[in-house]
UniProtKB/Swiss-Prot annotation:
Belongs to the andropin family. The lineage of its organism: Eukaryota, Metazoa, Ecdysozoa, Arthropoda, Hexapoda. Ejaculatory duct of adult males. The keyword Metal-binding does not apply. Induction: In response to mating. It comes from Drosophila orena. One of its GO terms (biological process) is innate immune response. This is Andropin.
Length: 67
Protein backbone atom coordinates (compact mmCIF):
# COMPACT_ATOMS: atom_id res chain seq x y z
CA UNK A 1 0.00 0.00 0.00
CA UNK A 2 2.88 2.36 0.75
CA UNK A 3 4.33 1.82 -2.72
CA UNK A 4 1.00 2.63 -4.31
CA UNK A 5 0.66 5.88 -2.35
CA UNK A 6 4.20 6.92 -3.23
CA UNK A 7 3.55 6.22 -6.91
CA UNK A 8 0.27 8.16 -6.86
CA UNK A 9 1.83 11.20 -5.19
CA UNK A 10 4.85 11.10 -7.50
CA UNK A 11 2.61 10.82 -10.55
CA UNK A 12 0.45 13.73 -9.46
CA UNK A 13 3.43 15.97 -8.71
CA UNK A 14 5.09 15.19 -12.02
CA UNK A 15 1.87 15.50 -14.03
CA UNK A 16 1.10 18.89 -12.51
CA UNK A 17 4.62 20.22 -13.02
CA UNK A 18 5.05 18.98 -16.60
CA UNK A 19 1.50 18.95 -17.88
CA UNK A 20 -0.42 15.82 -18.69
CA UNK A 21 0.15 15.97 -22.45
CA UNK A 22 3.92 15.85 -21.95
CA UNK A 23 3.81 13.33 -19.13
CA UNK A 24 4.99 10.15 -20.86
CA UNK A 25 6.37 8.98 -17.53
CA UNK A 26 2.79 8.65 -16.20
CA UNK A 27 2.36 5.57 -18.39
CA UNK A 28 5.67 4.19 -17.16
CA UNK A 29 4.69 4.71 -13.52
CA UNK A 30 1.29 3.15 -14.21
CA UNK A 31 2.99 0.09 -15.73
CA UNK A 32 5.31 -0.18 -12.71
CA UNK A 33 2.33 0.02 -10.35
CA UNK A 34 0.52 -2.70 -12.31
CA UNK A 35 3.62 -4.90 -12.23
CA UNK A 36 3.90 -4.47 -8.45
CA UNK A 37 0.22 -5.34 -8.06
CA UNK A 38 0.56 -8.47 -10.22
CA UNK A 39 3.66 -9.57 -8.30
CA UNK A 40 1.86 -9.16 -4.98
CA UNK A 41 -1.17 -11.04 -6.29
CA UNK A 42 1.07 -13.87 -7.52
CA UNK A 43 2.89 -14.00 -4.18
CA UNK A 44 -0.38 -14.24 -2.28
CA UNK A 45 -1.56 -16.95 -4.67
CA UNK A 46 1.59 -18.97 -3.99
CA UNK A 47 1.43 -18.59 -0.21
CA UNK A 48 -2.31 -19.23 0.19
CA UNK A 49 -2.17 -23.04 -0.40
CA UNK A 50 0.67 -23.36 2.12
CA UNK A 51 -1.31 -21.30 4.61
CA UNK A 52 -4.37 -23.51 4.09
CA UNK A 53 -2.31 -26.58 4.95
CA UNK A 54 -1.39 -25.22 8.39
CA UNK A 55 -4.44 -23.20 9.42
CA UNK A 56 -7.05 -26.01 9.36
CA UNK A 57 -4.81 -28.03 11.69
CA UNK A 58 -4.57 -25.11 14.10
CA UNK A 59 -8.34 -24.57 13.97
CA UNK A 60 -8.96 -28.28 14.66
CA UNK A 61 -6.63 -28.22 17.66
CA UNK A 62 -8.27 -25.11 19.13
CA UNK A 63 -11.75 -26.63 18.60
CA UNK A 64 -10.72 -29.89 20.28
CA UNK A 65 -9.11 -28.03 23.16
CA UNK A 66 -12.26 -25.98 23.80
CA UNK A 67 -14.42 -29.16 23.90
Amino acid sequence: MKYFLVLVVLTLILAISVGQSDALFVDIIDNVENAIHKAAKTGIGMVKPIENIFIPNQQKKSTEASN
